[in-house]
Amino acid sequence: MTVSRDSLVLIHPAVTQQPELLETIEKGSILSETTIVAQYLINKLNDGTISPDDEKYDVIYYVTPEKPEAIQFPPKLIPVLHKTLKPSGRLYGLSDTLKVDALINGFEIVSNNGSEYYWVKESREKKAPVSISLKGNMKNGASAPVALPSFKKLNKTQPIGSSPSAGLAVSLKKLPTFKKLTKKVSAIKLTDSDLEDDDDDLESDDSANNSKTKFFDDFDDPETGDSIDEDDLIAETEEDTITMIQCGKSKQRRRKACKDCSCGLKEMEEQEIESRRAKQQQVIKFSEEELTEIDFTIEGKKVGGCGSCALGDAFRCSGCPYLGLPAFKPGQSINLNSISDDL
């Protein structure tokens, strides 16, 4: 007679939209062999609404629609599930993403070539140490084991290779001993010869510095060394990278051309001014039909440009050019006094 095992089912909130997933797992080979005692949403266990008993379930199954590599499970619930499981109990539904937390909290990970994956709670039973008898077994006429050789401590006064009664003693060599230095080390005093050597070193350094300054003075001298022009350092190419507008006569950059400019800068400025004036002279001109479309004071124009509204209409369509204006007669002058009531 097999003993029934109790199981606990933890459900991810997203499984409520996929009830067929829960039915498939309950009919599977794992939960079908157990008695489902309780089913809880994982968020109720996470916020502390439900606290399961310790060592109550043999199997805990976590049902989630997430992929194994994308499972997001609260790590703080792993020790809680460890307490809830019985010794050697199994936890299904999690993956290697929480492998470290599982090992820390006392789980063993079992994976059968990817076909079955679960965590097992380690049993608290520890194997008793096995005692091995060193005495020989004398049953069935077995011969007694050979005794191990025994050794004696060497006596300092006993000669090697002879009995203690021998008169000769072996003198053991002692280790050398050292004494602590008690004298104070006197400070090293400088002699006159050492001071003279230092003076010689300073003089050699001064002579080296003087030779360096003399070299640079000779290099900067215009009589002995040629000066380098800055323009010579720029490589001349077919297309110069430096572009700057300069006056051909004064060779200076100016915002405006000078009076007697002959480099063409003045002509360029005049062309720019003429082009600006030409654009300003282009005034928008309307034809007579366009003017009648805009001018609503022309006599004989009873219908607006929309073709449906008249000048005297108080309510006009959205496309009428008279929209927003009061009803008036053609040729009537409009002033603020005439439309004060409408305002």
Curated annotation (Swiss-Prot):
Region (Fe-S binding site A): 247-263
Biased composition (Acidic residues): 195-206, 218-228
Region entry Linker, spans: 189-240
Requisite cofactors: [2Fe-2S] cluster; [4Fe-4S] cluster
Keywords: 2Fe-2S, 4Fe-4S, Cytoplasm, Iron, Iron-sulfur, Metal-binding, Mitochondrion
Superkingdom to which the source organism belongs: Eukaryota
Record InterPro entries: Anamorsin, CIAPIN1, Dre2_N
UniProt binding sites for [2Fe-2S] cluster: C247, C258, C261, C263
GO biological process, one term: iron-sulfur cluster assembly
Motif (Cx2C motif 2): 317-320
Cellular compartments annotated: Cytoplasm; Mitochondrion intermembrane space
Coiled-coil blocks: none
Subunit structure: Monomer. Interacts with TAH18. Interacts with MIA40.
Family label: Belongs to the anamorsin family.
Function: Component of the cytosolic iron-sulfur (Fe-S) protein assembly (CIA) machinery required for the maturation of extramitochondrial Fe-S proteins. Part of an electron transfer chain functioning in an early step of cytosolic Fe-S biogenesis, facilitating the de novo assembly of a [4Fe-4S] cluster on the scaffold complex CFD1-NBP35. Electrons are transferred to DRE2 from NADPH via the FAD- and FMN-containing protein TAH18.
Domain remarks: The C-terminal domain binds 2 Fe-S clusters but is otherwise mostly in an intrinsically disordered conformation.
Protein name: Fe-S cluster assembly protein DRE2
Organism: Kluyveromyces lactis (strain ATCC 8585 / CBS 2359 / DSM 70799 / NBRC 1267 / NRRL Y-1140 / WM37)
Phylogenetic placement of the source organism: Eukaryota, Fungi, Dikarya, Ascomycota, Saccharomycotina
